[in-house]
Amino acid sequence: MEHSTRLAHISEDGTRTQTVYDHLAGTARLAGSFAAPFGAQSEAEFAAWLHDVGKYSDAFQLRLKGGPKVDHSTAGAQEAWVRQHLHTAFAVAGHHSGLPDGGSPADDPGDATLFGRSKKPVAPYDGWQEVTLPASTPPAWACADPLSLAFFTRMLYSCLVDADFIDTETFMDGKAAPRGSGTDIAALRDIVSAQAQRYLSAESPSPVSVQRNTVLRACLEKGAHGPQGLYTLTVPTGGGKTFASLAFALEHAAAQKMKRVIYVIPYMSIIDQTAAVFSGLLGVENVLADFSNAEYKTVEQDDLTPAQYRQMLASENWDAPVVVTTAVQFFESLYANRSSRCRKLHNIADSVIIFDEAQTLPGDYLAPCVSAIAQLIQHYHSTAVLCTATQPALEPLFRRFAPELHPQEITPDAARLYEVLRRTTLQDLGTLPQEEFAFRLANHPQVLCVVNRRKTAQQLYAALPAEGSYCLTTLLCAADRRRQLDDIRQRLKEGLPCRVVSTSLIEAGVDVDFPVAYREQCGLDSLLQTAGRCNREGRRGAEESIVYRFRLDECSTPQMLRQNVSALDYTARHQDTLDTPRAIQLYFNELSDLRGPDAVDKHGILDAFLRGIRGCQFPFAQVAEEFRLIENAARTVYLPVGEGAALCEQLRSGHVTRTLLRKLGIYSVSCYKDQFDKLDAAGALELRPDGSAILTDTSCYSEKTGLAMDVETGIGLYF
């Protein structure tokens, strides 16, 4: 059959064309393959065949020749709507502008909701009748309840927009877009298995290594033979859970024929360290580190310049065998509505997902986060592992969303492991004046101090001897943090003076070993994380390796930590020893009681889909705005320091690639709005269209203390 010559795209140089039919067919092939792991291949193909039928219109053909803008998405959405494919209608309507709110039957044709767009007049597109739509029925579970339908809609949307982007990219570039790069999962499993055997067969292992090997053996065994589902890995800090959890993940992915491993960590500040460890073992080509905060706002694809289109495509798609990302990126993407953030979602299906430091999952959003994890396990062929030294009390929430899911603990005897791996003694120092406390720190040749505020860290650092003192906060770019941590480890190894004042970024996955540590008032989980940086290798007795809990006269407890501090105080009154599974369980139960039942979904994310918002059904756009794990959204500032200078020039040139953004990630700092605005007002920033900026006044950045917290007339002031 001869197909219509109606065009979907014209190449940049004007010499090549792609017909609408060919674009629909290519997109359908890709979308179907993306949805196959969760049994929705026909639905994704159905959506893809409809998504651009509006391009058959005379109005759109005129647009390709420079005519006025035209809405080409609504036509396909209306075709899905009349066929009662609600999820497809959402996906097609939003495949450029983002998933819309559902709205209500009373909405007008001019409203941006799906109800409104279902009534919107569109230009005739009769030529689309050459398309034969495939038979399609969504999986029964996808329509079982509003939460499942909303999640399925986002996953379907992800398959559609990623397929659309890739087919368009392939045509524009004149060659197939590279996909699925990297080594086979089974081959990566073999690499990690070989390394594991070297650890297990080492001669004369230390007592700590013996226990780490116990954990590793359990991970290898469960990974290879355990069923797909929900697991916990409860291991004290310093128990080797990073490598052991990776070993579990690759064994399990190979056994269950899953596509990838996704490692979700709490802080962007340690992505570089975790990715470096994995890359050194598996090869850089197999590990994708999701560094960048940049999000490219979606607009009508046909209105983008070639440079803007390349920039949009540079956002990460998570198509590597091993992905390292943050909890913020992971969960915000799952509740996003923009194509730039959602196109990766289908690649979460068919994965092993490791949640490192699971106790840091955001309390105010805990219910929607657990609901999403439950959906992935139940319907999207994924396995989740909650990996932590301080296992939070999440079982009641999992019972609520997935009663048949029963967490399986990987560690054979967690209580025994905690007893054997106890390497520190916890003491409460009480309250001290800041000046007296700084003097106390200065008298330690080697010491770690973790505080709650960056300003406090700066002040204490300023009071320490210059030689061998360090200040670690998220105001430092990853490149400088890495350099400082290398210096710190070397000085500790050589027995040289090494005094470190840090914010909590050092508590998650940073491998350092101090003889003594201090932790400003906090929750039990944070206290034990700091303890994991003291006598980590067990070379000293626990009685001489003290971790002090303290308060400063001049510093009030941050509002967000007050319930955690109260829960720790309660636990300390009822337990003689705080570093045991029993004490940890008591702490999290008390914390849950203090927060109350509504705190786990403080912003009503789940209710928005269950009941709507002020009559608006399925409010995808509103929820995406509300679901912000970092309430005061951070902005990315790129730093022209070191290798970052040349990278910033490449960014200015407009030739943006994934590789460039990945490299720039370690020369960037995320800062909050007030700090960003002050730098901008001082003329220190070159603003970019995506909301990020390049620092133009390098005096506002110090390799020792990071980006200025305050500025006056363009001069950085460090506190």
Which stretches of residues belong to each language-model region?
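Conserved helicase motor
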Residues: H9-E12, M268, A289-L304, N452-K455, ...
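Conserved strand-helix element at the start of the C-terminal RecA-like helicase core
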Residues: R260-I271, R440-P465
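Interdomain hinge/linker at the junction between the two RecA-like core domains of SF2 helicases
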Residues: A389-A442
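C-terminal helicase lobe and adjacent C-terminal extensions/tails of nucleic-acid helicase motors
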Residues: T88, I377, E435-A442, V450, ...
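Walker A/P-loop
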Residues: G226-A249
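Conserved Walker A/P-loop ATP-binding site and its immediately adjacent core
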Residues: M258-L282, A289-A294, A393
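Accessory nucleic-acid engagement/destabilization modules that flank
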Residues: M1-Q195
